[in-house]
């Protein structure tokens, strides 16, 4: 019954979205230039009465939003957008949520392009799909030409060239294009690092990166992997997907703010990752402004990362919740939706527990460096290699580290709930976007109706005035015609009288001549 109800509601939502898209197409065809004069006259001195124009940009944005909701409702997909700065540990938090390392960690911005991470049951090894790769190929060809004309010494002065950037430069010189699919963590890391380094390189060479080509969510890279926390759970109607968004002004690219705002507005819910040690910093303030701009259109949650750095003089959990909810977010997020955590501890603990569950032991700490990080966090700085051989001790230490990370609560209340109710989130998101579009369309059409009504009334008044003027003109014309006729008759009579007198006078004078 539940599944059937969800299906019927999704079908109705799909019908309404298609109807709204058709309505938007018709709305786009309405002439708007004629409203400018009305706006200036009617809105003079009153800003609230100015028209709401349907510009090409507005229509494109609304069209993208509705199409995005149509895509989500077709898949019953709940998209949880994750926003935060590089220093807040956004990538680490996503890795902790997924339960394995799907995003690379570097000490520089790593999200020039949004990336989807979709929970795919049974997909143990992550796979990245990058179908819309053509704009990147074109960019690399342009960069290849610029590099041929650019002095390498000059490039080193305007760009930090590390081993990853050097590999990218060699790749561009050789004309090696991006693949459409990458299987495994390391190939995915290499792809994402290269994409982000392309942004830095493009800026250094004065070439525009094709951000606009990736405004649509179906064009951005997608990583499919089974979330460890959701493995083995009951299959629910719907799909859970994380959206890794670019941070505000990330990598010195201020125009990414527009892309961030659009992606947040199109999400089903928003999860902000904040830095416990920098809650009042400028960077975290930019994150707060970004999610505050979304308003009440989507549910908001917050993870306060790096809570493991709390000391006896720092704010505790309740104080942090009160600070963020009240002072920093002005009540736009409730304390119950704020979770202080340690993403690094959560990621390391869950990764270790997963390795123990699947392989029965941890990998060699010399080959996989995360094992060293785990050992230091769970066993202390004085751990030894032999400690890793005590499987029961390691399992217990991983459980304690997971408990200390405080990640269990957000996983249960947010991730599990989002997965179980993904279809409901998708329906809620579609309903809200439909209502928002309907309200904006109604406001615009009401204004159009008001403008046309005012124009019609004014036109009727002007027509009446013209008709009255024509009547007055006719009356004046008739009066003048009578007066002119009368004057002509008087002049004709005077002329005839004068001619008769002259004739009589002439006859009187010439009469003696004929006697």
Residues covered by each model-derived region:
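Charged, amphipathic alpha-helical linker segments immediately N-terminal to NTP-binding catalytic cores
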Residues: 1-57
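Register-specific recognition of a single heptad position within extended alpha-helical repeats
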Residues: 4, 11, 53, 60, ...
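Catalytic cores of large soluble enzymes that bind and process phosphate-bearing ligands
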Residues: 5, 54, 58, 316, ...
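Secondary-structure edge/capping motif, primarily at the C-terminal ends of alpha-helices
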Residues: 27-38, 277, 417, 421, ...
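Long amphipathic alpha-helical scaffold segments
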Residues: 45-80
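Globular "head" domains of long coiled-coil molecular machines
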Residues: 67, 71-421
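C-terminal helical "lid" subdomain and adjoining coupling/linker elements of P-loop NTPases
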Residues: 388-405, 416-458
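A non-catalytic, extended alpha-helical scaffold characteristic of dynamin-superfamily P-loop GTPases
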Residues: 446, 450-515
């Amino acid at each position: 019954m539940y599944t059937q109800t969800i299906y019927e509601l999704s079908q109705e939502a799909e019908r309404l979205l298609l109807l709204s898209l058709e309505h938007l197409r018709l709305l786009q065809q309405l002439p708007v230039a004629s409203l400018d004069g009305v706006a200036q006259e009617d809105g003079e001195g009153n800003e609230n009465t100015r028209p709401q124009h349907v510009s090409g940009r507005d229509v494109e944005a609304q069209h993208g939003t509705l199409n995005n909701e149509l895509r989500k409702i077709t898949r019953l997909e709940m998209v949880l957008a994750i926003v935060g700065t590089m220093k807040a540990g956004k990538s680490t938090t996503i890795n902790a949520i997924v339960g394995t390392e799907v995003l690379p960690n570097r000490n520089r911005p790593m999200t020039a392009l949004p990336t989807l991470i979709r929970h795919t049951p049974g997909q143990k090894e992550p796979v990245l799909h990058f179908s819309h790769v053509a704009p990147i190929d074109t960019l690399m060809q342009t960069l290849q030409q610029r590099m041929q004309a650019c002095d390498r010494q000059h490039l080193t002065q305007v760009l930090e060239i590390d081993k990853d950037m050097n590999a990218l430069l060699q790749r561009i010189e050789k004309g090696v294009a991006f693949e459409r699919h990458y299987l495994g963590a390391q190939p995915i890391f290499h792809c994402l690092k290269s994409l982000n380094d392309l942004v830095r390189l493009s800026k250094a060479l004065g070439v525009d990166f094709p951000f606009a080509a990736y405004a649509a969510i179906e064009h951005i890279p997608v990583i499919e992997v089974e979330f460890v926390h959701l493995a083995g759970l009951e299959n629910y109607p719907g799909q859970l997907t994380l959206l890794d968004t670019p941070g505000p002004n990330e990598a010195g690219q201020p125009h990414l703010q527009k892309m961030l705002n659009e992606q947040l507005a199109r999400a089903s819910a928003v999860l902000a990752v904040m830095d416990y040690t920098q809650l009042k910093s400028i960077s975290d303030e930019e994150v707060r402004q970004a999610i505050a701009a979304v308003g009440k259109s989507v549910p908001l949650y917050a993870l306060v990362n790096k809570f493991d750095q709390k000391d006896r003089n720092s704010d505790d959990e309740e104080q942090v919740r009160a600070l963020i909810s009240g002072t920093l977010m002005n009540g736009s997020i409730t304390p119950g939706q704020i979770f202080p955590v340690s993403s690094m501890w959560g990621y390391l603990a869950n990764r270790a527990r997963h390795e123990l569950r699947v392989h029965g032991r941890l990998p060699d700490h010399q080959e996989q460096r995360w094992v060293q990080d785990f050992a230091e966090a769970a066993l202390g700085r004085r751990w030894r290699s032999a400690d890793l051989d005590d499987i029961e001790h390691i399992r217990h230490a991983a459980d304690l580290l997971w408990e200390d990370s405080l990640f269990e609560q957000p996983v249960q209340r947010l991730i599990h709930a989002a997965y179980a109710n993904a279809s409901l989130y998708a329906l809620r998101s579609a309903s809200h976007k439909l209502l928002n579009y309907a309200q904006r369309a109604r406001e615009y059409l009401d204004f159009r109706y008001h403008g046309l009504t005012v124009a019609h009334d004014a036109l009727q008044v002007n027509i009446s005035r013209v008709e009255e003027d024509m009547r007055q003109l006719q009356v004046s014309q008739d009066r003048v015609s009578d007066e002119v006729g009368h004057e002509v008759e008087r002049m004709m009579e005077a002329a005839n009288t004068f001619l008769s007198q002259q004739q009589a006078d002439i006859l009187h004078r010439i009469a003696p001549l004929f006697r």
